[in-house]
């Protein structure tokens, strides 16, 4: 099994210095792209690979790039932004690359920027990732010194400047247009689309925003080809995937596995199964803003299409496991509390609706719920769903709540009829 994304990770997590990274094959994709490929060739190769965005939405990466205006009449400067604002609860896969192999992200950004002929790039980093910040700054400086960044890179005539921007620490900055507003020094609220960032993004110029893991895949696709990348997978969704697991399992962590590895294999073979004395009840498969899956779904492949067919989303591919000694009502209340705090307040349903939902869940968890509260929550959740809010924050926030009421309804009812939390 090939693991291109994690092959350079070292014991102890210390990243390779640039010369050792080059010895291991690093920056070969930059030399290949700038030396023997046209920008459109890089985009077409990524298109043929069928690489999908690894930040949650799963949009085809090459197709996204193709929307950027090209040619002599294209507006400049163009921008490439690496979304490293990994704020989704339960998600920590990108941190592994940011801390352990920063040059892989820089190389991915250079090749991707060349494909769209970007002039400037930004790594938009989560505020709490201090170790990643230190290592990225060092790696960027090394890349400049080696001639991979700056003016006339490797004598190609193409120039690319790269900057590290540390977020102020808001979940909303993970939404690409909220991120762009933050980069511009504005309040991190989402923008109306269209126009899309590919046409009018950062400071009104063409901009691509890609996830850390997405960008880290690009050099390997350029070096090895689209067919190779498609062959890494066990499913129609191509490549490998960084899967993460948290919760009461024996070995929580992150693993690079073929896309389409089943939920059961990830949980049992890699995460080591449940801790002694605990039983599996459910799992949120792709970060906190995705629907629960339960035991009947354990043999489903963890890929975009299969998880969607099961009624959830692959999202970030990092799972939060629910065991039989953890209260599902308390777990969902904790998530809704987070989302209510992180609402940007731009639209009324999200600003008012999420705190109201969190308040009602707290009452149920504290044994103060009333008959009819569940029907009220269900009805209210639909009003926070797709088509009712300005962006996807609120619809994502109510996904774990809606699925918890579907799969664990008896637990909610016991809180109301017993006037107490059975787990306390």
Where are these predicted regions, by residue range?
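Cofactor-/ligand-binding subdomain signature composed of acidic, glycine-rich
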Residues: 1-45
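Short acidic, glycine/serine/threonine-rich loops at helix termini
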Residues: 57, 62-65, 91-94, 133-138, ...
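Conserved phosphate/anionic-ligand binding catalytic regions in large, soluble enzymes, centered on
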Residues: 47-68, 112, 169-181, 185, ...
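Ferredoxin-type iron-sulfur electron-transfer modules in oxidoreductases and energy-metabolism complexes
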Residues: 29-46, 76-78, 84, 93-98, ...
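Gly-rich Lys/Arg/Thr-decorated short loops/hinges at beta-loop-alpha junctions or inter-strand turns
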Residues: 21-27, 83-94, 197-202, 244-249
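Histidine-anchored nucleotide/phosphate-binding helix
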Residues: 101-115
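Short amphipathic, charge-patterned alpha-helical segments
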Residues: 108-112, 259-276
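Hydrophobic alpha-helical positions that pack around
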Residues: 133-259, 271
């Amino acid at each position: 099994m090939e693991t291109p994304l994690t092959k350079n990770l070292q014991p102890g997590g210390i990243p390779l210095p640039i010369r050792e990274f080059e010895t291991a094959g690093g920056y070969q994709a930059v030399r290949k792209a700038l030396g023997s490929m046209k920008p459109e060739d890089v985009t077409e190769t990524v298109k043929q690979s069928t690489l999908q965005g690894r930040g949650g939405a799963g949009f085809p990466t090459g197709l996204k790039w193709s929307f950027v205006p090209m040619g002599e009449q294209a507006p400049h400067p163009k921008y490439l932004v690496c979304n490293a604002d990994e704020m989704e609860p339960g998600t920590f896969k990108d941190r592994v690359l940011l801390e352990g192999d920063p040059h892989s992200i820089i190389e991915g950004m250079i090749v991707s920027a060349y494909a769209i002929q970007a002039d400037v790039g930004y790594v938009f980093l989560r505020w709490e990732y201090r170790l990643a910040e230190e290592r990225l700054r060092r790696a960027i400086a090394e890349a400049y010194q080696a001639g991979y960044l700056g003016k006339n890179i490797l004598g190609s005539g193409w120039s690319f400047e790269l900057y590290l921007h540390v977020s102020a620490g808001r979940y909303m900055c993970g939404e690409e247009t909220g991120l762009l507003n933050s980069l511009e020094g504005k309040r991190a609220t989402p923008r109306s689309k269209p126009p899309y960032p590919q046409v009018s993004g950062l400071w009104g110029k063409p901009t691509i925003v890609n996830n850390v893991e997405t960008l880290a895949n690009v050099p390997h696709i350029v070096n090895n080809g689209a067919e190779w990348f498609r062959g890494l997978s066990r499913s129609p969704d191509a490549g490998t995937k960084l899967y993460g697991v948290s919760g009461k399992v024996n070995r929580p962590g992150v693993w690079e596995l073929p896309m389409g590895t089943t939920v059961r294999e990830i949980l049992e073979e890699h995460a080591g199964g449940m801790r002694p004395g605990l039983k599996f009840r459910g799992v949120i498969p792709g970060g906190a803003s995705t629907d629960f899956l339960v035991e009947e779904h354990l043999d489903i492949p963890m890929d975009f299409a299969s998880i969607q067919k099961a009624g959830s989303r692959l999202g970030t591919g990092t799972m939060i496991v629910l065991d039989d000694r953890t209260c599902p009502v308390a777990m969902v209340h904790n998530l809704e509390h987070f989302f209510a705090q992180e609402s940007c307040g731009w639209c009324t349903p999200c600003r008012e609706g999420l705190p109201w939902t969190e308040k009602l869940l707290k009452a149920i968890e504290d044994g103060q719920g009333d008959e009819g509260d569940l029907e009220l929550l269900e009805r209210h959740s639909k009003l926070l769903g797709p088509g009712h809010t300005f962006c996807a924050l609120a619809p994502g926030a109510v996904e774990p709540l809606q699925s918890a009421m579907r799969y664990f309804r008896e637990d909610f009812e016991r809180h109301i009829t017993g006037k107490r939390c059975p787990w306390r």
